[in-house]
Amino acid sequence: NDKLKTILEIAESDGKGFEPTSFCSACLIRKPPRSKHCGTCDQCVGKFDHHCPWVGNDIGYNNHRIFMLFLLLILCIMILNLYGGIMFYKLSCNVASEDSLWNSILVFNSCSSWVLWMILNALFHVFWVTILTTIQIYQIVFIGMTTNERINRGRYKHFIELDGKSPFHFGP
């Protein structure tokens, strides 16, 4: 058992070389750098970014790339939804180009309220997923931090020593 082995090693070394910040008191294991214990999932996650209630899982070392791909695919799908809805209205509804936005929306609603709902829903999701994707790309590429590290950088020794900059950043 890894937990028992870790505890025995610490006990037998009389605490020499024991670094409390690299030990998870919940899992009773030595944590790798950049890992964090997620209270929701009750597990330590390497290169922990955040717990995502949307996917019901922690985002970290093993799945961050897949999560980014997931966000990009959602953006593509929502943009296709918008395009399809707009094309439906162009081909199926009599909307004059000189109509105001409000009149166009009323015509869209009378033509197909379901498609109007899909367009509004897609717009909402494009908005927040674009913000989330942009923040994730900024953190990964430009500052070399996870969301957890960016939020808690004042609590981590390796960030405090570098005035809040990431020692893991090797990008542009």
Predicted features, each with a name:
Residues 1-51, 55-172:
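Membrane-associated feature with strongest affinity for ZDHHC
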